[in-house]
């Protein structure tokens, strides 16, 4: 198998699972180089995972003729600059979420990719895992009848108690909807279809927050983005959904992250979309009880880089990637739509079109995409 060669830009907190899965799981991928502003981090990653090249700058990676896909794992407000430079250098790009810190950035990246005939896409890819794929199958096969609505909740108290450098979560491109919203919105549109318009209210509950994790314990951060966001979506199908994300609430973890899909004949309880599996429950009134549904698809474990591997397969076979920009752009427009609605007090129309990518193959062979 000819592997697609990847360069990783950014070796921060999320990079570990990507390094592991790219080098040990997905046969479509070959990680040939890493780059980070802190060179020691790149050196450590390269030594641990056998990566042959360490680039001094991202532009060195983009100039490497061996690199086919750039994996952008930088901080959210840096995504646009890195992805844009990679595309202009003629590289395909897979970016961590979000696509950009605002829709204008996503629009520019999409334009460049289309003009140059390059693939652009990105996270989240959790919807390709066993949990969401099984839920999609249940809905598509009619187990809850016609979907009429949804509810999604991500309730948390922020990142300053555990993350080693959490300040970017409260700056441009951060906040609960930009950080965690993409997991929920991506799952929702894969289960329910595209969104037509949105409405929202939001606020900054705590203008200053204190870091309690090491090594920055005691540092006080200014909060620049809304951290309590309640939104309503109207799907193109006519169904109505709600989504609530916050970094401000003390709440038990086991009850704080979920999606529910309501149908004309039943309700589906969807697992945490930040994970690749979890408990799936189905309620149908004629049964009178809620029953647990087993996983029907592969990749129940933490399989981040699955979307990157899918892009590599798409690149070599000529099909569309499942995590393509048409999806990440639609999600970004929804998120910005919430901000616009909260500011204006009006519904915001979502203009981008969205189509669901094909479901994952069954059965799956771990490490090989269909």
Spans of features found by a protein language model:
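Active-site loop of classical SDR/Rossmann-like NAD(P)-dependent oxidoreductases
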Residues: 17, 297-308
């Amino acid at each position: 198998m000819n592997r697609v060669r990847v360069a990783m830009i950014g070796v921060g907190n999320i990079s570990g699972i990507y390094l592991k899965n790219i080098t040990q799981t997905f046969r479509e991928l070959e990680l040939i180089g890493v780059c980070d502003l802190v060179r020691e981090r790149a050196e450590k990653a390269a030594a641990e995972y056998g990566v042959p090249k360490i680039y001094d700058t991202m532009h060195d990676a983009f100039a490497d003729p061996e690199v086919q896909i750039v994996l952008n794992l930088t901080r959210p407000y840096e995504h646009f600059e890195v992805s844009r430079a990679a595309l202009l250098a003629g590289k395909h790009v897979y970016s961590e979420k979000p696509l950009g810190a605002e829709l204008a950035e996503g629009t520019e990246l999409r334009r460049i990719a289309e003009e140059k005939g390059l693939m652009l896409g990105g996270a989240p890819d959790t919807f390709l895992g066993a949990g969401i794929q099984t839920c999609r199958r249940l809905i598509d096969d009619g187990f809850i009848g016609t979907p009429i609505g949804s509810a999604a909740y991500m309730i948390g108290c922020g990142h300053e108690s555990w993350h080693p450098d959490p300040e970017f979560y409260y700056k441009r491109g951060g906040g609960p909807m930009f950080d965690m919203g993409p997991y929920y919105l991506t799952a929702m549109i894969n289960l329910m279809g595209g969104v037509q318009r949105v409405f929202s209210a939001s606020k900054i509950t705590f203008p200053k927050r204190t870091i309690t994790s090491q090594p920055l314990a005691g540092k006080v951060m200014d909060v620049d983005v809304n951290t309590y966001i309640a939104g309503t979506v109207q799907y193109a199908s006519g169904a109505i959904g709600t989504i609530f994300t916050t970094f401000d609430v003390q709440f038990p973890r086991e009850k704080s992250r979920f999606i529910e899909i309501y149908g004309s004949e039943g309700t589906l309880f969807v697992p945490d979309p930040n994970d690749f599996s979890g408990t799936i429950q189905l309620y149908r009134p004629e049964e009178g009880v809620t029953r647990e549904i087993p996983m029907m698809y592969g990749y129940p474990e933490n399989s981040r880089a699955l979307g990157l591997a899918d892009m590599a397969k798409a690149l070599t076979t000529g099909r569309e990637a499942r995590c393509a920009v048409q999806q990440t752009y639609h999600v970004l427009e929804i998120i910005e739509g919430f901000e616009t609605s909260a500011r204006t007090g009006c519904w915001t129309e979502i203009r981008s079109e969205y189509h669901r990518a094909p479901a994952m193959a069954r059965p799956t062979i771990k490490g090989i995409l269909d």
